[in-house]
Amino acid sequence: MIPAIIPYYKNKSQLARCISYLEGQTVPVEIFVRDNDRDNVYYTAAVNEGIKKYLDQPYKYILILNQDMYLERTAVERMAAFMDSHPDCGIGAPLQLHSGNPDYVIFAGGCEAFPLGRHQHGPLQEFTEDKEILWANGACMILRREMIREIGVLDENYVLIGSDSDYCFAARSRGWQVWRIAGARGIHECGASGKLCEPNVELLKIKDMIYFGQKWLTGELYQELSHKGAELTPEWVSQVMNDLQKAQAELEQMCENVVTAGR
């Protein structure tokens, strides 16, 4: 049995489809849905609520996935088998396939994580091998419970984005590996945790990225762990942080204007 945690928000058809695919897996899956319609704690806190539910139970692995992630029927079994045969792997990720073209991979491993995430992508035939990667996309990742007990849960200073890459960097800094598992696949519709391009949602994303920069980009560790870390000069980091803070101020003003107009 492998528990699966789904942060849910405002799309019943996506959730029903996601659950249907989990129920059709070749290994048993226990499903925990954190209903953010009821009270929206956003992605990171929702995931942590599920992790804490299962952390003291005798499961080897915990699966995290978005409501718009639809796993092939052998995906969970393949991920668990890979983790069994790679004891140093703390986090595993399947190939995420384009919802309109399942022969195209939209996530095969993280590249840059800051200021916005960029992923390895391309035709499916280019990603036939398992590979150690820098970070996994939080739309679907399997976590080793032993690792969670060592490094803790996700950092809730992130609200909507960034906690997945942050968690992978934290794991790798403690000696754990992150892998893409090529034999495990799923369709990803994209955008379930933060699809609306509203000022308040965009503001949350900006704040998450500012926090990521403040946490990781002030020392040499991130350069060692990140994609093309040597190119992250202090001047570049300073410029990007200034741009993010400017964008934050503009979005805060937009949000204030919306509130004022609604009074």
Residues covered by each model-derived region:
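Glycine-rich, basic loop-to-helix element that forms the pyrophosphate-binding segment
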Residues: 38-54
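A conserved hydrophobic helix/loop-capping motif in glycosyltransferases and polysaccharide synthases
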Residues: 2-11, 18, 25
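Short, acidic, metal-binding catalytic loop of nucleotide-sugar glycosyltransferases
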Residues: 20-33
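Short beta-strand-to-loop acidic/aromatic patch adjacent to the donor-nucleotide binding site
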Residues: 59-70
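Active-site acidic Asp-centered loop
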Residues: 36, 65-67, 155
